[in-house]
From Swiss-Prot:
It catalyses: L-methionine(out) + ATP + H2O = L-methionine(in) + ADP + phosphate + H(+); D-methionine(out) + ATP + H2O = D-methionine(in) + ADP + phosphate + H(+). Belongs to the ABC transporter superfamily. Methionine importer (TC 3.A.1.24) family. GO terms for cellular component: plasma membrane. Residues 1-26 are annotated as: Disordered. InterPro entries: AAA+_ATPase, ABC_transporter-like_ATP-bd, ABC_transporter-like_CS, ACT-like_dom_sf, MetN_ABC, MetN_ABC_transporter-like, NIL_domain, P-loop_NTPase. Its EC number is 7.4.2.11. GO terms for molecular function: ABC-type D-methionine transporter activity; ATP binding; ATP hydrolysis activity. This is Methionine import ATP-binding protein MetN 1. SUPFAM superfamilies: ACT-like, P-loop containing nucleoside triphosphate hydrolases. It is found in: Cell inner membrane. Its main location: membrane.
């Protein structure tokens, strides 16, 4: 990954208050009993309890209508909760209004799916706009904007208009604009959904670099598990306004417990190929080999060792399908093995297979082609 040097002009316009030592162990963001109800009785969020650590990249995923946007918009009070609390650095923001609310929103930047750039203003002018509104002196605005252009890699596009930019470049402008007030938290509302795959990867890499270099806490919502896998430290899964699963990314990917999570992960997991599915039988017939599913959840930090698998099972083993990926330093995935074991020896084979995988499942017997 490219090493990024933070420009000197990215020093805060105004120094942030020094946090007391007791805040080092305090969640940066804490939600307690959070609920959101819209007119007409629509309950968008229900009993949300959540803690987000300082400096982490935290993902919120769910299907359309799950409550993702409602949740993220309560963090900067674009939406007022109907019940419960939102605490930033241990302080309930529910009663904020006027200047306190303005100050809060300057500490919390936000980027959006559709960029929200002003078409008649240049890149430089779009980035500078929040500072002009805040009455920052022109010289400091120019210095700050120059540093942000360097940070997001748009120095050569400073005088371009949004219509002259690609989708990825527009989102870089959005990121720069969100950082003008030196926020401590960055909210990302489907920030890559309108981008092509190459631009998505570039924006995610930029966000991760910004997280590491500036120490930002990043909270992002998405419906794409690939985005969670690429950038997040932890994730929650929402369904019908409730949290149905949460944990470290490797935990949720390696051993999803809820049906919604498994559905969202479907396209990323090694599914049983159609030709094998057609030949699969639950009852053995005429010496048909058994199909074993060796699963690696990351819990044991075990790495698939094909030689050890063959030795442990002690039978003829064919690797028919599978996939292993590394997430947060752990090997996750599955191997589908065809094992020529007689029915009487199957219990022993399963016991041995359990020594070399986190989970073992018999999928059936493979009929001869």
């Amino acid at each position: 990954m490219t090493t990024m040097t933070v420009p000197p002009s990215l020093l805060p316009l105004e120094p942030f208050p020094t946090a007391p030592d007791t805040r080092a162990s305090t969640p940066h963001i804490r939600l307690h009993g959070l609920g959101k109800r819209y007119p007409g009785g629509v309950q968008a969020l229900r009993e949300i309890d959540l803690e987000i650590r300082r400096g982490e990249v935290f993902g919120i995923i769910g299907r359309s209508g799950a409550g993702k946007s409602s949740l993220i918009r309560t963090l900067n009070r674009l939406e007022r909760p109907s019940e419960g609390q939102v605490l930033i650095d241990g302080e309930d923001i529910g009663g904020y209004d006027g200047q306190r609310l303005v100050a809060l929103r300057r500490r919390i930047g936000m980027i959006f799916q559709h960029f929200n750039l002003m078409s008649a203003k240049t890149v430089r002018q779009n980035i500078a706009l929040p500072l002009r509104v805040a009455g920052v002196p022109r010289a400091r605005i120019e210095e700050r904007v120059a540093g942000l252009l360097q940070l997001v890699g748009l120095e050569e596009k400073r005088d371009a208009y949004p219509a002259q930019l690609s989708g990825g470049q527009k989102q870089r402008v959005g990121i720069a604009r969100a950082l003008v007030h030196q926020p401590q938290i960055l909210l990302c509302d489907e920030a890559t959904s309108a981008l092509d795959p190459e631009s998505t990867q570039a924006i995610l890499a930029l966000l991760r670099d910004i997280n590491r270099r500036l120490g930002l806490t990043i909270v992002l919502i998405t419906h794409e598990m690939a985005v969670i896998r690429e950038i997040c430290d932890r994730v929650v899964v929402l369904e019908c306004g409730r949290i149905v699963e949460q944990g470290e990314v490797w935990e949720v990917f390696g051993d999803p417990r809820h049906a919604v999570t498994r559905s969202l992960l479907g396209s990323l997991r090694a599914a049983l190929p159609a030709d094998l599915q057609a030949r699969l039988r639950q009852a053995p017939g005429g010496g048909d080999p058994v199909l074993l599913d060796l699963q690696y959840t990351g819990a044991s930090r075990r790495v698939p060792d094909l030689l050890a698998i063959a030795r442990a099972i002690g039978q003829r083993v064919d690797l028919l399908h599978g996939g292993i990926e590394r997430i947060q330093g752990r090997a996750l995935g599955r191997l589908l093995l065809q094992v020529g074991a007689p029915p009487g020896e199957l219990p022993g084979v399963l016991a041995k297979a359990a020594l070399v995988a986190d989970k073992v499942e018999v999928l059936g017997h493979v009929a001869h082609a």
